[in-house]
Swiss-Prot record:
Keyword annotations from UniProtKB, A to Z: Calcium, Lectin, Manganese, Mannose-binding, Metal-binding
PANTHER family given in the database record: CONCANAVALIN A-LIKE LECTIN FAMILY PROTEIN (PTHR32401), LEGUME LECTIN DOMAIN-CONTAINING PROTEIN (PTHR32401:SF47)
Sites where the protein binds a carbohydrate: 12, 99-100, 225
Entry binding sites for Mn(2+): 8, 10, 19, 24, 34
Protein name: Mannose/glucose-specific lectin Cramoll
Transmembrane region(s): none
InterPro entries found in the cross-reference section: ConA-like_dom_sf, Lectin_LegA_CS, Lectin_legB_Mn/Ca_BS, Legume_lectin_dom, Leguminous_Lectin
The record's account of how the chain is modified after translation: The alpha and beta chains are produced by partial proteolytic processing of the lectin precursor by an asparaginyl endopeptidase.
Domain of life: Eukaryota
Organism: Cratylia mollis (Camaratu bean)
GO terms, molecular function: D-glucose binding; D-mannose binding; metal ion binding
Family: Belongs to the leguminous lectin family.
Binding positions (Ca(2+)): 10, 12, 14, 19, 205
Length: 234
């Protein structure tokens, strides 16, 4: 199975798999059952910003999700990624819909990793302020596609309307050196802007930023509440 560390923007509470009874952001370590969550209210049809950072000295993974002029939601969890992730990883964005639906549109995405070691100054930086129609630097999986407006659509959209039972992911093509033999782990920052929109009152399921082994693919049956990340709810 894939090794996944993720930050979820979860728009539908699945209390049967340990979700709180409200929309939330969460930190997931190798399981859809979040290690830490905080309440988050999605604003239907508004552009939001998610900022994820890992401090490799403090060994703390943090996320802040906000809307312009609104309040922000913050969650953090202490974890040593050296013990969890392989030495080389890929970073990606994932989203899903199930019975309920929403657009999972990404308008921009940036990432920077930086090693704390002077010996291994291998770092990676990328910025997408828009997405080309046939992106050579992205690995698109499942229903993910780029549209003529320069946006990344992680799940299926038809004539501007979100579709149910859809799952898609986009990974940056170049692997990231997340730690080396001296056990020095890279710090990183990721930011993406997103638009979640639905004509329905009930929406689902959410967007996640994730880090995985370089050959990671969408697990079979991982749509809906599993956000395209995990094969089951364990």
């Amino acid at each position: 199975a894939d090794t996944i560390v993720a930050v979820e923007l979860d728009t539908y509470p699945n209390t049967d798999i340990g979700d709180p009874s409200y929309q939330h952001i969460g930190i997931n370590i190798k399981s859809i059952r979040s290690k830490a969550t905080t309440r988050w209210d999605v604003q239907n049809g508004k552009v939001g910003t998610a900022h994820i950072s890992y401090n490799s000295v403090a060994k703390r993974l943090s996320a802040v999700v906000s809307y312009p002029g609104g309040s922000s939601a913050t969650v953090s969890y202490d974890v040593d990624l050296n013990n969890i992730l392989p030495e080389w990883v890929r970073v990606g964005l994932s989203a899903s819909t199930g019975l309920y639906k929403e657009t999972n549109t990404i308008l921009s995405w940036s990432f920077t990793s930086k090693s704390n070691s002077t010996a291994d100054a291998q770092s990676l930086h990328f910025t997408f302020n828009q997405f080309s129609q046939s992106p050579k630097d992205l690995i698109l999986q499942g229903d993910a596609s780029t549209d003529s407006d320069g946006n990344l659509q992680l799940t299926r959209v038809s004539n501007g309307s979100p579709q149910s039972d859809s799952v898609g992911r986009a990974l940056y093509y170049a692997p990231v050196h997340i730690w080396d033999k001296s056990a020095v782990v890279a710090s990183f920052d990721a930011t993406f802007t997103f638009l979640i929109k639905s004509p329905d009152r009930e929406i689902a399921d959410g967007i996640a930023f994730f880090i995985a082994n370089t050959d990671s693919s969408i697990p079979h049956g991982s749509g809906g509440r599993l956000l395209g990340l995990f094969p089951d709810a364990n």
